[in-house]
Design a protein with these regions (language model features):
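N-terminal small/glycine-rich loop or linker at the start of catalytic domains
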Residues: 11-27, 81-99, 123, 128
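Beta/alpha (TIM)-barrel catalytic core signal, keyed to glycine-rich beta->alpha loops juxtaposed to Asp/Glu
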Residues: 132-302
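N-terminal binding-site loop/beta-alpha segment at the start of enzyme catalytic domains
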Residues: 1-79, 301
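Conserved residues at the C-terminal ends of beta-strands
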Residues: 22, 54, 127-130, 160, ...
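Acidic (Asp/Glu)-rich catalytic clusters
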Residues: 10-15, 45, 67-79, 116-120, ...
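Short acidic capping loops at alpha-helix termini that bridge into adjacent secondary structure
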Residues: 18, 75-78, 82, 122-126, ...
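Active-site groove signature of glycoside hydrolases
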Residues: 116-135
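Short, acidic/polar
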Residues: 30-43, 101-119, 140, 165-168, ...
Length: 302
């Protein structure tokens, strides 16, 4: 089995594993703390040392922290990413509000402190703005980032789901370079490959992180014409490439893009995670990549 290597996210950024383990659905995996720790050790053994979490992911940070507490030495072998900025609807009947974004300095500082406490760690390797806030004040974010970095609570900063203009706006006011933009990339939805987002990151030599690489499972189960076409093409290519699954082919398609994405694996099944690592060994050529593009679009290139 190929070992997942580490790569720099950007010229001044951290080294993360080429595949990232996502913990969004950790609660749904229904694992005991020991089972969570075992899973963590298993994917670290594969070389997947970078883990993705967020303040809004239910109690996933707490559950991850419980596992880490069983073997605190594992902290030295992983890189932890978390996110801030999405406030859910209040549970109190007397406090009526809508889910909203918040990138104020006070929210950033308190959210990060709470993430650190839930995870049971003293420092995040990377903190991301989860979604662009329409009321974003760059100076507020810059001050918060500086405080968090100077206090040793966060090493690096990035964004998630930012457009090119939003990325440039935030970067213009920061004292440190953004090290990534976590964006949706999959064979069903790859708008970021066409709207300038990936072009910007290539120019900056900054790797995107790719979320929803399997389109939330739609590649396997959706009955839309697009999904049916894609499954047929992915199955055909799996045979040509010697892949063990269409899962591998989908990840190989993402990995081939010259922006050099770092795909996030969403499964808590170590067999599925191990299978995904095999995508790194597939040698997909240009024509094969465009066959997936064509199956998604339902037309060829002009």
């Amino acid at each position: 089995m190929q070992q997942v290597s580490k790569v720099k996210t950007s010229p001044t950024g951290p080294e993360f594993s080429q595949l990232i383990q996502g913990y969004w659905r950790l609660a749904a995996w229904e694992m005991s703390p020991q089972e969570r720790l075992t899973f963590l050790k298993q994917h670290v053994e594969l070389g997947i040392t970078t883990v993705d979490n967020a303040a809004i992911y239910g109690n996933s940070e707490v559950l991850f922290g419980e596992a880490l507490k069983l073997d605190p030495t594992m902290r030295d072998h992983i890189e932890i990413i978390s996110k801030f900025g999405i406030n859910g609807i209040a549970t109190s009947e007397t406090e009526k509000r809508v889910s909203h974004y918040d990138s104020s300095q006070s929210l950033i500082l308190s959210s990060t402190e709470n993430s650190l406490k839930r995870l049971g760690v003293e420092q995040l390797d990377c903190l991301l703005v989860h979604r662009p806030d329409f009321l974003m004040e760059v100076d507020q974010i810059a001050e918060a980032f500086t405080k968090l970095q100077n206090s040793g609570k966060v090493k690096h900063f990035g964004v998630s789901n930012f457009s090119t203009s939003q990325f440039e706006l935030l970067q213009s006011g920061l004292g440190q370079p953004l090290v990534t933009n976590q964006i949706e990339i999959n064979p069903i939805n790859f708008d970021v490959l066409e709207d300038g987002t990936s072009d910007q990151l290539q120019r900056l030599k900054t790797r995107p992180m790719a979320w929803s690489c399997l389109a939330g499972g739609d590649l396997f189960t959706a009955e839309t014409e697009q999904a049916i076409r894609l499954r047929a093409t992915l199955t055909e290519l799996a045979s040509e490439l010697g892949a063990t699954s269409i899962n591998q082919v989908a990840f190989a398609w993402i990995l081939k893009h010259p922006s050099n994405p770092l795909p996030i694996i969403g499964s808590g099944n170590i067999q599925r995670v191990t299978d995904t690592v095999g995508a790194l060994s597939l040698q997909m050529n240009t024509e094969q990549w465009y066959r997936i593009w064509t199956a998604s679009k339902d037309h060829g290139v002009a």
